[in-house]
């Protein structure tokens, strides 16, 4: 620590406080500014684009300094939090008028990316999560806290791959890991990673602190008693939250045990490829959520995002949601609910700020308005017969006493902050009313007093006045002073007048001189009392907020079902996926022409479709729409199809498109193979797999062989698979794999121009239309013409070469010119003798590397 003796008393105070918070930027309150010094000032000046200056000297050197006005701090804090910085807010808690030496200061809260709760610093449509992990490569404990809602969950996860996929789903703003973990672990590639002392994860201490927080003897009631790693992580989160908030956390009331087996698992690649709530460019437009989310409240939009990113496998829950949506669609009942739900606002985060004791006056006004809207909402719900909706109505309840309390206490349009008062309504508190009246109506009181005293004494020249030295007084001319009543007490003698004070005027003086400051202090005290009373009702209010958010989502899904022509899917016990007239919910919204709907049939007999057809023909759209229909069904929503019948799936995999992972040192093909390996290792007969153009990132031989072997492996696994490819050789797979069928996207050529029809038809495609697509893309005409010449020559010189599945003597399916025929080589002879059914994917990969060395 710096030698404090070299510095001024004020800077000594600063260094002592900064020493306690070395990792945070210190916002040090000085009058109307927050000042930053030394390295904090340099960093803030760069990040916030503010002026770096100097404040005199301390220790013989100029002090780098940067400052921001305290009344506009929110905007700067928001920018710092988005950049991943943490800030310690140091306020003046002493009175400058009475302080000897520097005004007493104290860090009142720490703002970090994962614990921020201020409305202005948050994205209202996204969860803001704090996470912690503990364990090793075999088993991890993961704890997740949303301090802005009170949701607190734990789970245990096997292996880095599953953990990283879960972290990508959660996308925490801040991630805590033990300080004794080795450097460079996969988790550290994420944003907002902070190392904490190993003892912060101590499991015994964590168990004790969690039980104390929830008021229980143990954690058995939460179903996580034996999750020792997760409990250690949760204890670290709780300690970190208390450290940063500097207050109790009454809105953290329970711990939820999340289980991956209860959900449809999507890895990071699948979530990105399906563009659930973030598109491939990082924006929110043209995503699934942008189409299906018309929720009235921000808390419902966040719940919708959680549903989309964590589909369920609980058929009872899903069918209860479906029944609720159907009920809300009857007689357009959702239309009666949505305007009333809009009045509720973001109740979830308002209640969290009340629990954190940093709720602002407008939060209480919004809570008042929300509670006032509940009776009408309850009346509208009385006709809803669906059991799940009735249960939600019971949980929502009404709070007439709290609604009345807030209506009496808070003015209609309060200011943003309590700092300057003007929040509490007149008539709520007699003492406050009197103080405010004294402060605001002192002049009128003095005029009334003067009139009364003139009438009482009969002295017409009597005056009531005030000066800063002697205070309030009654003044009489010297000649009338002897006629002053007995209760007049002499206060000051002037040359031509005498000044007096009376007990009534003295009492008024005592009140009036301090009325403004006392009124503000009283108003702040009343505000704190309001918060305390609300905290006493926090548990049922939070339950109501959760139920209101779910009701909003269900009403939204009913509205979307009506306006997007969605229909109720049916879950069945036998394994199948049947879709009639399925549509892509996002693509059809942006098309200027009608979307071409298509069917899909997968069941016990057909587990895989090999999809061929031209580029831009609709293969990827067809596959993605299938995944989105399945996903929507697994959140309980209606789906964009005329009819859908399906069994529950355990995972949705997508291998669609790739790009280089330059930061990770991985090529496009390496990324593609990593995703393929993940699918081959983890797909089951209950999974849905989308494979698009596997093998295109390497040489023709390698790519075709890998695609072939991967398709055969998935066929043996019996996962529901859509396998799109331009390797027409793969269309012979049904001859060796009975559970595989061919379909194609049709197109036609007219005047050497391609016309995409987008219909999915049985059987393989007859040609690829590659040159027509190139022409459509704007490839120069001479290049297209030269390509046609090359194509004709290749078609005449390349003879069909017998593929493994044709050795039975069956005729080959239509395909492009064989890629092997014009390239005689010993490797081809070896390849022709191999039966792909007899080798594993690993053996195929080994052979490819061996052949590559020889070619």
From Swiss-Prot:
Database matches in SUPFAM superfamilies: DNA repair protein MutS, domain I (SSF55271), DNA repair protein MutS, domain II (SSF53150), DNA repair protein MutS, domain III (SSF48334), P-loop containing nucleoside triphosphate hydrolases (SSF52540)
Species in which this protein is naturally found: Pseudomonas aeruginosa (strain ATCC 15692 / DSM 22644 / CIP 104116 / JCM 14847 / LMG 12228 / 1C / PRS 101 / PAO1)
A Pfam family per the record: MutS_I
One GO cellular component, as annotated: cytosol
Keyword Disulfide bond in annotation: no
Family per similarity comment: Belongs to the DNA mismatch repair MutS family.
PANTHER family in the cross-refs: DNA MISMATCH REPAIR PROTEIN MSH1, MITOCHONDRIAL, DNA MISMATCH REPAIR PROTEIN MUTS FAMILY MEMBER
Coiled coil: none
Keywords, sorted A to Z: ATP-binding, DNA damage, DNA repair, DNA-binding, Nucleotide-binding
Superkingdom of this protein's organism: Bacteria
GO biological processes: mismatch repair
InterPro entries: DNA_mismatch_repair_MutS, DNA_mismatch_repair_MutS-lik_N, DNA_mismatch_repair_MutS/MSH, DNA_mismatch_repair_MutS_C, DNA_mismatch_repair_MutS_clamp, DNA_mismatch_repair_MutS_core, DNA_mismatch_repair_MutS_N, DNA_mismatch_repair_MutS_sf
MF (Gene Ontology): ATP binding; ATP-dependent DNA damage sensor activity; damaged DNA binding; mismatched DNA binding
Annotated region described as Disordered, given as residue ranges: 796-816
Function: This protein is involved in the repair of mismatches in DNA. It is possible that it carries out the mismatch recognition step. This protein has a weak ATPase activity.
Listed name of the protein: DNA mismatch repair protein MutS
This protein's encoding gene: mutS
Binding residues for ATP: 613-620
């Amino acid at each position: 620590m710096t030698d404090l003796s070299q510095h001024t008393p004020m800077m000594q105070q600063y260094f002592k406080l900064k020493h306690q918070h070395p990792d945070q930027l210190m916002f040090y309150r000085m009058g109307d500014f927050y000042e930053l010094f030394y390295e904090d000032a340099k960093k803030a000046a760069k990040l916030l684009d503010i002026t770096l200056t100097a404040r005199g000297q301390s220790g013989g050197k100029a002090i780098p300094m940067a400052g921001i006005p305290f009344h506009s701090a929110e905007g700067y804090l928001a920018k710092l939090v988005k950049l991943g910085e943490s800030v310690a807010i140091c306020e003046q808690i002493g009175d400058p008028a009475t302080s000897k030496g520097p005004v007493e200061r104290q860090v009142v809260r720490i703002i970090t990316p994962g614990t921020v709760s201020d409305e202005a610093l948050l994205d209202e449509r996204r969860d803001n999560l704090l996470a912690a992990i503990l364990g090793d490569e075999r088993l991890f404990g993961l704890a997740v806290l949303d301090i802005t809602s009170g949701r607190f969950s734990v789970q245990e996860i096997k292996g880095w791959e599953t953990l990283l996929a879960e972290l990508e789903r959660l996308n925490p703003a801040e991630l805590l890991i033990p300080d004794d973990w080795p450097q460079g672990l996969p988790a550290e590639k994420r944003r907002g990673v902070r190392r904490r002392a190993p003892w912060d994860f101590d499991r015994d201490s964590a168990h004790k602190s969690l039980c104390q927080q929830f008021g229980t003897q143990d954690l058995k009631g939460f179903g996580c008693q034996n999750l020792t790693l997760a409990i250690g992580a949760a204890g670290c989160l709780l300690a970190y939250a208390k450290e940063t908030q500097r207050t109790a956390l009454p809105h953290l009331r329970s711990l939820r045990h999340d289980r991956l087996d209860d959900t449809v698992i999507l890895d990071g690649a699948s979530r990105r490829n399906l563009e659930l709530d973030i598109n491939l460019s990082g924006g929110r437009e043209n995503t699934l959520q942008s189409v299906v989310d018309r929720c009235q409240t921000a808390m419902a939009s966040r719940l919708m995002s959680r549903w989309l990113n964590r589909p369920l496998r609980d058929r009872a829950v899903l069918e209860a949601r479906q029944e609720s949506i159907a009920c809300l669609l009857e007689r357009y009942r959702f239309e009666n609910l949505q305007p009333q739900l809009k009045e509720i606002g973001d109740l979830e985060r308002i209640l969290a700020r009340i629990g954190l004791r940093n709720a602002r006056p407008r939060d209480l006004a919004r809570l008042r308005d929300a509670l006032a809207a509940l009776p009408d909402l309850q009346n509208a719900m009385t006709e809803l017969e669906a059991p799940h909706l009735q249960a939600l109505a019971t949980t929502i309840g009404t709070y007439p006493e709290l609604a009345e309390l807030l209506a009496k206490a808070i003015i209609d349009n309060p200011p943003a902050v309590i700092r300057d008062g003007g929040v509490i309504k007149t008539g709520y508190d007699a003492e406050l009313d009197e103080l405010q009246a004294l402060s605001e109506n002192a002049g009128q009181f003095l005029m009334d007093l003067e009139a009364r005293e003139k009438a009482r004494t009969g002295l017409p020249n009597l005056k009531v006045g005030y000066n800063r030295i002697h205070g309030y007084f009654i003044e009489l001319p010297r000649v009338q002073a002897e006629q002053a009543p007995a209760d007049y007490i002499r206060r000051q003698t002037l040359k031509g007048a005498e000044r007096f004070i009376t007990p009534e005027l003295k009492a008024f003086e005592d009140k009036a001189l301090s009325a403004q400051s006392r009124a503000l202090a009283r108003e702040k005290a009343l505000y704190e009392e309001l918060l305390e009373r609300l905290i006493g009702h926090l548990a049922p209010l939070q339950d109501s907020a959760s139920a209101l958010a779910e009701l909003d989502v269900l009403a939204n899904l009913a509205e979307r079902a009506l306006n997007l022509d969605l229909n109720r899917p049916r879950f069945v016990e036998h394994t199948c996926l049947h879709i009639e007239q399925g549509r892509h919910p996002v693509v059809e919204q942006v098309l200027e022409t009608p979307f071409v709907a298509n069917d899909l049939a997968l069941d016990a007999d057909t587990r895989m479709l090999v999809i061929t057809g031209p580029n831009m023909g609709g293969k990827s759209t067809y596959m993605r729409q299938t995944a989105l229909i399945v996903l929507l069904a697994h959140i309980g929503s209606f789906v964009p199809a005329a009819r859908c019948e399906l069994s529950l799936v355990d995972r949705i995999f997508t291998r669609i498109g790739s790009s280089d992972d330059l930061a990770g040192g991985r090529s496009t093909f390496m990324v593609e193979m990593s995703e393929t390996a993940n699918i081959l290792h983890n797909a089951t007969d209950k999974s849905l797999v989308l494979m698009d153009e596997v093998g295109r990132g390497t040489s023709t031989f390698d790519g075709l062989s890998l695609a072939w072997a991967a398709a055969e492996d998935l066929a043996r696994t019996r996962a529901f698979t859509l396998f799109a490819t331009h390797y027409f050789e793969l269309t012979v797979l049904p001859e060796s794999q009975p559970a595989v069928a061919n379909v194609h996207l049709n197109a036609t050529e007219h005047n050497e121009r391609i016309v995409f029809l987008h219909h999915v038809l049985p059987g393989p495609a007859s040609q690829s239309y590659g040159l027509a697509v190139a022409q459509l893309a704007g490839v120069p005409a001479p290049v297209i013409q030269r390509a046609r010449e090359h194509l004709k020559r290749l078609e005449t010189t390349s003879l069909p070469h017998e593929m493994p599945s044709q050795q039975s003597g069956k005729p080959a399916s239509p395909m492009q010119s064989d890629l092997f025929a014009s390239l005689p080589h010993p490797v081809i002879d070896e390849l022709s003798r191999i039966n792909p059914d007899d080798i594993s994917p690993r053996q195929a990969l080994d052979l490819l590397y061996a052949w590559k060395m020889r070619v």
